[in-house]
Amino acid sequence: MSKEANRDGYRLAHTMIRVRDLEASFNFYCKTLGMKILRKTDYPDGRFTNAFIGYGLETESPCLELTHNWDQKENYDKGNGWGHVCIETRDVYKACEDLSKLGVKITRAPGPMKHGTRVIAFCEDPDG
């Protein structure tokens, strides 16, 4: 049996995703999904911007780190290890209806997940 580490003070802080168009991502995550920009820092010497967005204080709830590399012109390769970012809502059916009206592409209509009963749906952000 392996030993357990002392996890006192551990918490999930953020997940980082790279975005091609920071303003389009702000529009999607903040205006469409209701997140707030928690902080944004430009790094001119490195030619990138980091922005942290979320629904609560960065010190209290997990957030997304959006990294915008200024010279990136091509879409990012997501690889086969990346899955998704989950955002929970009270009514996934209504949320998808509202998002569709705003032009958001729903890639999996709301319904029970395979081999389960939890209702899920998927949509695309500006980077797909």
What are these regions (language model features)?
Residues R7-Y10, M16-S61, K101:
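Core segments of cupin and vicinal oxygen chelate
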Residues D21-E23, N69-D127:
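Vicinal oxygen chelate
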Residues A5, D42, N50, N75-D77, ...:
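Compositionally biased, low-complexity repeat tracts
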Residues M1-R7:
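Basic/polar N-terminal segments that are highly enriched at the extreme N-terminus
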